Swiss-Prot record:
Residues that, per the record, bind Zn(2+): 153
Subcellular location, principal: virion
Subunit organization: Homotrimer. Interacts with the inner capsid protein VP2. Interacts with the outer capsid glycoprotein VP7. Interacts with the outer capsid protein VP5*.
GO cellular component: viral envelope; viral intermediate capsid
PTM remark: The N-terminus is blocked.
Example GO biological process: fusion of virus membrane with host plasma membrane
The name this protein goes by in its record: Intermediate capsid protein VP6
Residues that coordinate or bind Ca(2+): 266, 286
Region of interest: Interaction with the inner capsid protein VP2: 62-73
Length: 397
């Protein structure tokens, strides 16, 4: 994997800097590095593809070295270099696609394609020029079963979940109380509602709770907490739990009271915040508990009082909500990130070449299914293919 990264970094630099008119002295170190790459690769044969519709391709390396010059690089020099660069880039692209198409239930973090396994040989170690990539560093740590630390912005840590729980119900569905939520990606939105606006609740206050269990622990998370859940702020028709009927939800938004958010690790509270909105920090957690209240307004204007009558029918439904959004966090496991294209790149390659469903990844790389059942085998394979995708992205956009 380190060799693949070093090859890609060298080729990217060569493509960007070996251009007509450039002083040789400005790129002499790069050209020496480029020549070292050619010397190491010459005389070797590789094969890629042969899975799904990814075609089998054979690669032979037998290139001359780039020479020295006292002057600027001329058109012939650059054209010769470009021919070599384009062949190498095509090779790297196919090695990456071959690797992204493969998976293994055992030691899935290790190279799976024939070409990348060959590049892991001792003879290619001299190509290791630059291993500064975060993904390469963490791939090395994971390969040795040591602690990794990926920094994610907008991490897709929450599997998609959209549902409701009714704490008070009846066949007519005309006086309901409960919670509804939407968890997805890096965001939780939860709403508590009471058709009667807590008229019969103790002290006219309804208590709500929403707990979300993470599939992997996060650390040093920057989080935004807002006293609103905009996705539940408009009328809608909702299917009943048994699917036998539908019920009408017509929210009128109130501000939540006594809001508390707890971040837990292995059942122990690590951080807790009360009545604090905006940016908050969570040190280390694998579960989130949101607690909040709906309080019937003690004083109401006639217009508000008309919204919340003392008895049925209840045409408007008192609702309070919260939004919790993870802006950035560190995770020991690799995750999809809304700010990165790695999952999209891997999925696109596997779809384009009709890669058959293997023993590890779900059909279509369905992220909700993948993260819901995030096994060590999936974690290993995902770290490998994401690392390869990050390498490929240096050369192929």
């Amino acid at each position: 994997m380190e060799v693949l990264y070093s090859l890609s970094k060298t080729l990217k630099d060569a493509r960007d800097k070996i251009v007509e008119g450039t002083l040789y002295s400005n790129v002499s170190d790069l050209i020496q590095q480029f020549n070292q790459m050619i010397v190491t690769m010459n005389g070797n044969d590789f094969q890629t593809g042969g899975i799904g519709n990814l075609p089998v391709r054979n690669w032979t390396f037998d290139f001359g070295l780039l020479g020295t010059t006292l002057l600027n690089l001329d058109a012939n020099y650059v054209e010769n270099a470009r021919t070599i660069i384009e062949y190498f880039i095509d090779f790297i692209d196919n090695v990456c696609m071959d690797e992204m198409a493969r998976e293994s239930q055992r030691n899935g973090v290790a190279p799976q394609s024939e070409a990348l396994r060959k590049l892991a040989g001792i003879k290619f170690k001299r190509i290791n020029f630059d291993n500064s990539s975060e993904y390469i560093e963490n791939w090395n740590l994971q390969n040795r079963r040591q602690r990794t630390g990926f920094v994610f912005h907008k991490p897709n840590i929450f599997p998609y979940s959209a549902s409701f729980t009714l704490n008070r119900s009846q066949p007519m569905h005309d006086n309901l109380m409960g919670t509804m939520w939407l968890n997805a990606g890096s965001e939780i939105q939860v709403a508590g509602f009471d058709y009667s606006c807590a008229i019969n609740a103790p002290a006219n206050i309804q208590q709500f709770e929403h707990i979300v269990q993470l599939r992997r622990a996060l650390t040093t998370a920057t989080i935004t907490l807002l006293p609103d859940a905009e996705r539940f702020s408009f009328p809608r028709v909702i299917n009943s739990a048994d699917g036998a009927t539908t019920w009408f939800f017509n929210p009128v938004i109130l501000r939540p009271n006594n809001v508390e958010v707890e971040f837990l690790l292995n059942g122990q509270i690590i951080n807790t915040y009360q009545a604090r909105f905006g940016t908050i920090i969570a040190r280390n957690f694998d579960a989130i508990r949101l607690l909040f209240q709906l309080m019937r307004p003690p004083n109401m204007t006639p217009a508000v009082n008309a919204l919340f009558p003392q008895a049925q029918p209840f045409q408007h439904h008192a609702t309070v909500g919260l939004t919790l959004r993870i802006e950035s966090a560190v995770c020991e496991s690799v995750l999809a990130d809304a700010n990165e294209t790695l999952l999209a790149n891997v999925t696109a390659v596997r779809q384009e070449y009709a890669i058959p469903v293997g023993p590890v990844f779900p059909p279509g790389m369905n992220w909700t299914e993948l993260i819901t059942n995030y096994s060590p085998s999936r974690e290993d394979n995902l770290q490998r293919v994401f690392t390869v995708a990050s390498i490929r992205s240096m050369l192929i956009k």
